[in-house]
A protein has these predicted regions:
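Sequence-level preference for short, compositionally simple segments enriched
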Residues: 1-378
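Alpha-helical transmembrane segments of integral membrane proteins
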Residues: 402-408
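C-terminal membrane-anchoring or membrane-association module
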Residues: 408-429
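C-terminal low-complexity, Ser/Thr- and acidic/Pro-rich disordered "stalk" regions positioned immediately N-terminal
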Residues: 373-401
Length: 429
């Protein structure tokens, strides 16, 4: 896939559509050009196109606070994503694609091994994802870049800790957010926004928040916590790079993050009964004795929940939730829900007015082909690469011999041994 990207130019008005045959693609990909589309050749998406790799962040630092990689796969949170949509890749879209980071999902799954491992990092404006799956554990989907707009249309996102995070303005319509289980863990956070004060943040509309059966009734699962909306605190960094908090002034904003104001909104969404009654969590750090200390600047946190309902469809009554942490919980009637939805979409910059983004209509970028819509899932045929150090090789997924069709006028190309047919499509208006 990376070779196909490198061999073809594109723009927002002369799009490059990669029509990808179902199968596993084990590679780390960076999209740098505007107007690129990844599309599953099976329009029904019953057979998966899975892009997978296994890189991570150990969050290891030296005494000066400099990141210290532990091996060649330890790239840090900003660089470990399986697929990165770079800042110049305006207008990227994906249809029926699975983005997966195998770290902590397929390999390194033992208790104590959970660590950030991003599956998809979007750094561009006007990113559109249709019926796609994003799979990881901690830090699965990173929507990055203040003012950037991301629209997630349906699909599925899976993780355990902060698995939708970042400072972009992102709207999720009818998406399932699944809290996966991890060995030795009985807690998790759906989101970790570090929205700027001018941003709207993460908006989840008519979404379904589900939780793995492995979590018991004592699980501490929250809708999110406020990344970088910190109060002023002091800390000591030890020789091994670890640090601990020595003091916190909750009434003063942290001078390093004066413009951060974490914002997350849930609207008309279905909530698992296993989500905490407190709904949200503060951000904490450890003190010298190992106790968690609240370091959140509460006044700048913008968490809201509107018209949530349980698995049966019954509306949740805010009166039953007396100790909501940080955010607000409101009951709305249908007219109020519609008004709030319109308000949020306009604030996010979606629409047809000047300066707004006309979001794609969701139609697949090419016609239905029954040849890609029958039979069972593609079976991998060749051993995969990029196994993480100490990974169980027997558990590593394999790579199928799949074909990419690049949707320039039916001209066959050959890139990196893959048959390519390029077709251009103008930008959707």
């Amino acid at each position: 896939i990376q070779a196909a990207l490198d061999a073809n130019d594109s723009s927002e008005t002369d799009r490059l559509v990669l029509k990808i045959t179902p199968g596993d693609y084990r590679e780390k990909i960076t999209v740098t050009k505007p107007g690129v589309t990844f599309a599953n050749a099976d329009v029904t998406a019953k057979r998966a196109v899975t892009i997978r790799a296994s890189y991570y962040s150990s969050n290891t630092f030296d005494a000066d606070g400099k990141f210290v990689p532990q091996d060649e796969f330890d790239l840090g949170t900003n660089k470990c994503a399986t697929v990165t949509i770079g800042a110049g890749a305006t207008g990227f879209s994906a249809y029926g694609i699975t983005f997966q980071n195998d770290y902590n999902v397929v390999d390194h799954t033992a208790a104590g091994e959970q660590t950030p491992a991003v599956a998809l990092n979007t750094q561009a404006d006007k990113v559109y994802l249709k019926n796609s799956r994003i799979i990881g554990r901690q830090d699965t989907l990173y929507v990055q870049g203040a003012g950037n707009r991301v629209y997630v249309d349906g699909g599925y996102i899976e993780g355990t800790v902060d698995f939708v995070f970042g400072d972009a303005n992102a709207y999720f319509a009818g998406t399932e957010l699944h809290m996966a289980a991890f060995a030795g863990k009985n807690n998790g956070y759906f989101t970790a926004a570090n929205t700027k004060k001018s941003g709207v943040g993460l908006v989840f509309d008519r979404c379904n928040l589900t939780v793995a059966a492995a979590y018991d009734d004592d699980a501490k699962l929250s809708l999110g916590r406020p990344w970088q909306t910190f109060a002023q605190y002091t800390q000591v960094r030890k020789g091994d790079g670890s640090s601990y908090v020595t003091g916190v002034d909750l009434g003063t904003k942290n001078s390093a993050y004066t413009d951060t104001s974490s914002a997350v909104t849930y609207l008309d969404s279905t909530m698992s009964s296993k989500i905490t009654k407190n709904r949200w969590n503060v951000w904490t750090s450890k003190n010298q004795s190992g106790k968690s200390v609240d370091v959140t600047f509460h006044d700048d946190v913008r968490f809201a929940e509107y018209a949530s309902h349980d698995e049966t469809g019954a509306l949740l009554d805010p009166a039953d939730y007396k100790n909501v942490v940080l955010g607000s919980m409101s009951a709305l009637d249908e007219a109020q829900v519609q008004a709030k939805r319109a308000e949020l979409l306009a604030a996010l910059g979606f629409g047809s007015a000047a300066g707004q983004w006309v979001v794609p209509d969701g139609a697949w970028p090419f016609a239905y082909d029954p040849n890609y819509s029958t039979g069972t899932d593609v079976q991998p045929t060749q051993p995969g690469g990029n196994a993480s150090p100490n990974a169980d090789s027997a558990a590593m997924p394999e790579t199928g011999s799949a074909i990419i069709a690049v949707v320039v006028v039916a001209v066959p190309l050959l890139v990196a041994g893959l048959a390519l047919v390029a077709v251009r499509r103008n930008r959707q208006q």
